[in-house]
């Protein structure tokens, strides 16, 4: 981006949805020097603990589960990684919530020093409508972090 656009690379934020939300969390936790803000919609918070994550990590990283920790947002926080305050929005009617997402586990490990705002929304699922409803809050979250000195 810095090569193509007149961007201030000292003021970057990252966000995503679902697995992209997990990517945003892990990148921010692994590279807090690169990102001043982070947010996610319905992220997979602990892929090492869910069927989809086990399949993906096993396929890409092998069966040695200790290697997965560096790519799992919950494990990164457990291992002491920190980043700027995180905003997560989660729909309570999300069909992936119970088995795949594990935001409660992420919230638990963040209680030990990682600033987190986890907002739970009844009546919302994993869809575009959910994101469209709350995207302005995420933009404001990033704007606050990126416009302060």
Predicted features along the sequence, with ranges:
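Non-catalytic cap/lid and distal C-terminal segments of serine-dependent acyl enzymes
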Residues: 1-149
